[in-house]
């Protein structure tokens, strides 16, 4: 987890220096093909996270409800939130951030009563496995690429790392609580070890039986923020590049995902399971190098024009 966060920190440093002072709006207007690529990529990523929300909701909260019933309020909320622009998105996410984060921290604190410190002790390690695991965790952070879309418009200096450091501490807390509660072997074979950890946590006095609901809410809200972010930035890339593409882009993303909800839960889910690592690692590579190349090309052309 620590190595993955270090990799993510290096990623942010690259973005900070490559995109500083350059609005991605201008870059996409110059390279229109890039706007189309971003729209298609972000639509696929949005479908993936939409699938995650539907899966979590149907499995843990509303098992008898259809995907259309669950998906409609999600897409409507995402649309209303995104129509207000980046500022409104930020305010909405600020409003729900502590609402879901504090219960998660509470669950992690209670889980400490069940920790086995022997399970957390490192008695041997393999450098290759640690590197592979670190790269996988880093790849799972691929929505970090959103920073390319607003770094150039930031006027208050370099990217601050305080919130990123807090995220690393949160990841370490989830990791320690899960492995310390379930043990290494069970964590490796359990398909959803974090949920199993939360289900084993008990509140003193038995006041509340299902503390895993806090964790479910955290995952759903967190995934929703990423899902709506992909739809927002995908449509923003089209809106700023093609003057008549906004309505078409909105219809294909919000309406299209809703119409094909059953397909997403069946065929698309099968593809994701089969090619999961291709999807994750491909996103990581493209999300880093594609915008980096675009911004470097922009800087070179601007420099040549001045000469």
Predicted segment positions?
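Membrane helical hairpin/interfacial module
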Residues: 1-69, 73-76, 285
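Hydrophobic, membrane-embedded alpha-helices of multi-pass small-molecule transporters
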Residues: 3-11, 38-42, 46-49, 70-73, ...
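Membrane-interface interhelical connector segments
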Residues: 182-211
């Amino acid at each position: 987890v620590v190595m993955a966060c270090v990799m993510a920190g290096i990623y942010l440093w690259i973005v900070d220096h490559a995109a500083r002072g350059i609005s991605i709006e201008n870059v996409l207007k110059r390279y229109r093909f890039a706007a189309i690529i971003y729209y298609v990529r972000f639509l696929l990523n949005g479908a993936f996270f939409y699938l995650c929300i539907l899966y979590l909701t149907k499995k843990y909260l509303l098992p008898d409800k259809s995907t259309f019933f669950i998906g409609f309020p999600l897409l409507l909320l995402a649309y209303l939130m995104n129509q207000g622009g980046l500022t409104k998105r930020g305010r909405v996410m600020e409003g729900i951030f502590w609402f879901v984060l504090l219960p998660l921290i509470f669950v992690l604190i209670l889980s400490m009563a069940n920790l086995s410190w022997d399970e957390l002790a490192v008695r041997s390690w393999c450098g290759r496995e640690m590197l592979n695991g670190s790269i996988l965790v880093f790849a799972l952070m691929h929505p970090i690429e959103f920073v390319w879309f607003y770094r150039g418009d930031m006027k208050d200096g370099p990217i601050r790392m305080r919130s990123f450091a807090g995220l690393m501490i949160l990841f370490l807390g989830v990791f320690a609580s899960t492995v310390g509660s379930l043990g290494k072997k069970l964590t490796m074979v359990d398909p959803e070890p974090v949920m199993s950890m939360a289900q084993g946590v008990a509140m003193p006095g038995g006041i509340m039986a299902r503390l895993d609901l806090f964790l479910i809410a955290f995952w759903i809200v967190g995934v929703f923020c990423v899902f709506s972010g992909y739809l927002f930035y995908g449509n923003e890339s089209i809106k700023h590049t093609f003057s008549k593409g906004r309505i078409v882009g909105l219809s294909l993303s919000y309406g299209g995902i809703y119409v094909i909800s059953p397909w997403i839960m069946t065929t698309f889910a099968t593809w994701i399971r089969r090619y999961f690592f291709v999807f994750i690692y491909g996103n990581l590579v493209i999300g880093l190098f594609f915008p980096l190349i675009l911004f470097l090309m922009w800087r070179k052309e601007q420099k040549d024009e001045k000469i």
